[in-house]
Amino acid sequence: MAGLTQSPSPPAPSLLSAQTEGGEFVESLGFNGTLLAQMFNFLVLLILLRAVAYKPFMNMLEKRRELIEGSIAAAEEDKKQAEQLRATLQADLQRSREQATEMMARATKNAEEQAQQIIEAAKAEAARVKDSALSEIQREKERAVAELRDQVATLSILVAGKIIDQKLNDDVQKDLVNKFVKEAGDLPC
């Protein structure tokens, strides 16, 4: 109230009449009429300010508060959605890692199985080649033994013919050859 100054304008007619008529009464109570008029003016100004400035200002503040609360709620909702998206992406990433690990394990297992199959096939081929070679060697051995028997028989006949220096008949000659071949067949080769 110290900042309020007294206006040089004359008091309003209603106040003037109240001052003149009841001015003595008010003054007898120890009140100054000017002070009462200033209080009345302040109340009127307060009511006008409330109607004109305070309510729009408060409405603006309320709208601003609602806007801020809405922004905070939207930010919290966005944060929740971002958190859900992050969790989903994290789960997808983990699932992808597990699938990649599983694929690598399967590929390694398949490669090991193929390597084992190749080794087994090579062993089987080596065994087949070995068996074939052994069979061929056995056939060659048998053929060589048969040729050797034939040559031994022929040589035996020639040697026997020269030793005996006589001509044997065919039956005796065959018996001698067969006996010699049989004895030669029992020899270790």
UniProtKB/Swiss-Prot annotation:
It comes from the Bacteria. GO terms for cellular component: plasma membrane; proton-transporting ATP synthase complex. InterPro entries: ATP_synth_B-like_membr_sf, ATP_synth_b/b'su_bac/chlpt, ATP_synth_F0_bsu_bac, ATP_synthase_B_chain. It is found in: Cell membrane. One of its GO terms (molecular function) is proton-transporting ATP synthase activity, rotational mechanism. Keywords: ATP synthesis, Cell membrane, CF(0), Hydrogen ion transport, Ion transport, Membrane, Transmembrane, Transmembrane helix, Transport. The chain crosses the membrane at residues 35-54. It is a single-pass membrane protein. NCBIfam families: ATP_synt_b. F(1)F(0) ATP synthase produces ATP from ADP in the presence of a proton or sodium gradient. F-type ATPases consist of two structural domains, F(1) containing the extramembraneous catalytic core and F(0) containing the membrane proton channel, linked together by a central stalk and a peripheral stalk. During catalysis, ATP synthesis in the catalytic domain of F(1) is coupled via a rotary mechanism of the central stalk subunits to proton translocation. F-type ATPases have 2 components, F(1) - the catalytic core - and F(0) - the membrane proton channel. F(1) has five subunits: alpha(3), beta(3), gamma(1), delta(1), epsilon(1). F(0) has three main subunits: a(1), b(2) and c(10-14). The alpha and beta chains form an alternating ring which encloses part of the gamma chain. F(1) is attached to F(0) by a central stalk formed by the gamma and epsilon chains, while a peripheral stalk is formed by the delta and b chains. Belongs to the ATPase B chain family. This is ATP synthase subunit b.
